[in-house]
Amino acid sequence: MVRPQAVIFDLGGTLVDSPWRQEEMDRRWMCSYRALTGHYPDAGWPDGEAYVRAMGEAEAAHWQRVGQEQWSGSPAGLLSEGFRRLGCEVKEQELSTALDGYAQAIAGWATPFSDARKTLCELRRAGYRLGLLSNTWWAAEWHNADLATHRLDELLDVVVYTSDLPHSKPHASVFLEVTTRLNVEPESCVMVGDMMIDDISGALGVGMRAVWKRNTRWIRPTHIVPTATITHLGELPRLLSQWRES
């Protein structure tokens, strides 16, 4: 096999630990609602419970479509769908305010795994190009703010969010987009992720090696076989070194 030259990481569940509890998701939408009604109190908005429910349904529909079609969408598109479900006509400034409220709610949303920064530093010293590929509807600047807070941004050569692309993982085009930006061939890349279908099958499909980071949250499909499996990111440098020397 070709010696690895670049490593591409998933974000949530791989580099960072992120809360996805229902109460946390509802809290974010309520923050969005409060920002909206605080700035535009006389616009005749529905009550907060209805807003949270409609936006949550729009978010669930987004992810369902991602799973079925490998589609992608933007933050503005998702909130617009939520307002449609509410039967509300929304102006551009109102939409922007609702988005800003959500963005404030997710500031500091995730915590890097304890070995994330150390592993990235080791891989950079070893000469690997490093990339990030995340399935998300969130705006790039929302994610980038958190990466900067934890000083992970300075260790990544390329960062790609599917909210900026027409497709989501496991669609081949998003993996090839990252390899193009890294200026390496897919066969020279290693994808590291915690989701078997999105990360592992997608990477294998374009000729990459694929390292599955164990995650008991998701059901593991038995028909997908990763190139290697790890429990902690700290296992990566040794694994990659073995591949380089083989």
PLM region spans:
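Asp-based, Mg2+/Mn2+-dependent phosphohydrolase catalytic module
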Residues: 1-7, 18, 43-46, 117, ...
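N-terminal helical cap/lid subdomain that shapes the substrate entry/recognition surface
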Residues: 2-126, 140
